[in-house]
Amino acid sequence: MLKFIQNNREGTALLAILTLFALLGIIDRNYFSLQTFTMIFSSAQILILLAIGATLVMLTRNIDVSVGSITGLCAVTVGMALNAGFGLAASCLFALLVGMVAGFFNGILVTWLRIPAIVATLGTLGLYRGLMLLLTGGKWIEGLPADLKSLSTPILFSISPIGWLTMLLILAMAWLLGKTAFGRSFYATGDNLQGARQLGVRTDSLRIFAFSMNGVMAALAGIVFASQIGFIPNQTGNGLEMKAIAACVLGGISLLGGTGTIIGAILGAFLLTQIDSVLVLLRLPAWWNDFIAGLVLLGVLVFDGRLRCAVERNIRQQKYARFTAQAIISDKKPTVSDNNPAASNKKKAAL
């Protein structure tokens, strides 16, 4: 059972989502509907985008805790560009470029300067957050044009253009990681860095690419945030890094690298957003969200560690049982002297 759970984390996350839907559907019949599903998906888009980027980084056995600050910085970038008179496309491209540069800088710190990822990105967390506040003077950005808000307006099947783009990104990343040699390089790098290098994988370039794409996903999340609420607070992105990591771990992405799928991370993000919707349904204050996210992350990490130890212990017991069985069988095999009485008599005569 434990081995099944470890090898099917995506299925476990999906089962948890369906179970929560069923329980809430019993409590409130209006909850179990297509409208509720699309509403949760719309709310989950920011976390899904962050989980996509975090997956790439975590698969290479790294971590990025600056994505919340990058999200806020890029949201401010697109807002300031729009208010300065730039078009929507140019403003979004500028924000994506800022996110890519921020992620690239993280990758340089980790890969070339050999700074541990947690230390490097803790530093850039404060750096990017401070830059965001310097640009805004600590003020909110308001008066955003309607063009930006149209990105989150439902157009087809109650899903917005950003929603459709998010689904395309999910499919593209699932194909990249699961069906291409380049995608498998992420797993090889996280599983065994030296072994991947011997196989010809350009591990430094790959890790820099992972951090850069993480920055792009954070920038896209910042654009989605600005389009959904129509203004940009000075605390935009706070705490999102913890939720992104929690979503990935919940969906089966290992902090030790080399394990997990993008689908699992997406399901983890959806489950966390669903839990937030439960808090709204129960009319609990909004500050419970971070508490629940931290509690879920801690619980999943503890469970994941205990599960891994239990599975390894079970594997060792099975190996020991097979070794013992083989030893017993070899002891019971008849010797040459047992099968040949003449050889046994000659041996006795020699003695």
UniProtKB/Swiss-Prot annotation:
Transmembrane segments: 14-34, 39-59, 70-90, 93-113, 115-135, 155-175, 213-233, 252-272, 284-304
Keyword Transmembrane annotated: yes
Main location per the UniProt record: membrane
Molecular function terms from GO: transmembrane transporter activity
Record's keyword terms, sorted: Cell inner membrane, Cell membrane, Membrane, Transmembrane, Transmembrane helix, Transport
Family under the similarity heading: Belongs to the binding-protein-dependent transport system permease family. AraH/RbsC subfamily.
PANTHER family, A to Z: ABC TRANSPORTER PERMEASE PROTEIN YPHD-RELATED-RELATED, AUTOINDUCER 2 IMPORT SYSTEM PERMEASE PROTEIN LSRC
Complex formation: The complex is composed of two ATP-binding proteins (LsrA), two transmembrane proteins (LsrC and LsrD) and a solute-binding protein (LsrB).
Protein name: Autoinducer 2 import system permease protein LsrC
Organism annotation: Yersinia pestis
Gene: lsrC
